[in-house]
Amino acid sequence: PPLHEFLPHEDDEIKELADEMGVSFDKLKGKVESLHEFNPMLGTRGCRLDVLYPEIAEMQTEAIVSAAINVWKEDDLHITPEIMVPLVSEVNELRFVKKVIKAKADELIEQSGLKMKYMVGTMIETPRAAVTAGDVAKEAEFFSFGTNDLTQMTYGFSRDDVGRILETYFDKKIL
């Protein structure tokens, strides 16, 4: 989801969160307002969050790898976590985020003493990623296809409103 979906919107919500965080209402409200986006579906989401805030990728990697380590140790199930980087448009985005993921995952696995393997892949969900999939494949160990966003960005249809448009397009043999 876009970044704004994780943020409080109403003043009372901002005040409550500011109190919990031990920061001023004005400081938090200013931060929330600075993160507002006019078109969040094409804004700060997916791997863009990880590029802007690498600590998010670190935290998510720690959660995934720590859970896998616990399963190995507690249940003796030798699993291979597959960590997927979403909404990649450019191979350098994946390369950057993969480096963050690998650093954290390798650190945790070394500390555990296990010989656990993991994979880092991506979701192809932008036209740019689809067109440059050959380059992206050099960095990704697996692919998944995000057809909702890929279709939305390719055709310029809103996935929330496309139903009524597509019915007519199909009837008129446009698509």
Descriptions of predicted regions:
Residues 1-175:
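Conserved alpha/beta-domain cores
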